[in-house]
């Protein structure tokens, strides 16, 4: 884990994604262990707490050393995971906001609609816009090359609005 994290940081990563999968059993302990391990070994690197297990995200936040930056909740969307915006807001965390609902947005109009919904939800809960990082959801480049320019346009639209973006 440490070797892989160092490789990512050496390559220019600005945060590390701590993906423990669904981790239904022992997820809370696993996330706590991973957060402590990475924060003890790397200075000033924010960590993205990535799991569908909400209790594991909360456990990671509970041991997070904020002198190394804010924790990042990965992720919320405009459908079944919108409550992760509330979780991030309640814990003064950043949230990766996926610009989708029940499925991938079909075009930038739909992406921007989801972006607006997510931004409004965060701001209603007291979040700064800078604490929402919008992910337009990159599609498989090989299979859907015609959609990639739209994704790049969406990133520019986020930037033009003063919003942060990310992608994975």
Question: Language-model segments: what does each one mean?
Answer:
Residues 2-8, 81, 117:
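Short, acidic/polar
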């Amino acid at each position: 884990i440490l070797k892989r994290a160092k490789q990512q940081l050496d390559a220019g990563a600005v945060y590390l994604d701590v993906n423990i999968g669904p981790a239904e059993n022992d997820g809370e302990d696993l996330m706590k262990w991973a957060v402590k391990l990475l924060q003890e070994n790397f200075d000033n690197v924010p960590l993205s707490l990535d799991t569908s297990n909400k209790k594991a995200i909360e456990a990671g936040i509970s041991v997070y050393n904020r002198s190394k930056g804010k924790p990042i909740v990965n992720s919320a969307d405009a459908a079944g995971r919108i409550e992760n915006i509330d979780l991030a807001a309640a814990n003064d965390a950043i949230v990766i906001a996926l610009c989708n609902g029940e499925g991938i947005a079909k075009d930038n109009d739909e992406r921007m609609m989801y972006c607006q919904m997510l931004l409004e939800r965060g701001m209603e809960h007291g979040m700064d816009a800078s604490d929402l990082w919008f992910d337009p959801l990159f599609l498989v480049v090989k299979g859907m090359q015609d959609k990639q320019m739209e994704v790049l346009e969406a990133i520019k639209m986020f930037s033009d609005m003063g919003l942060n973006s990310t992608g994975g």
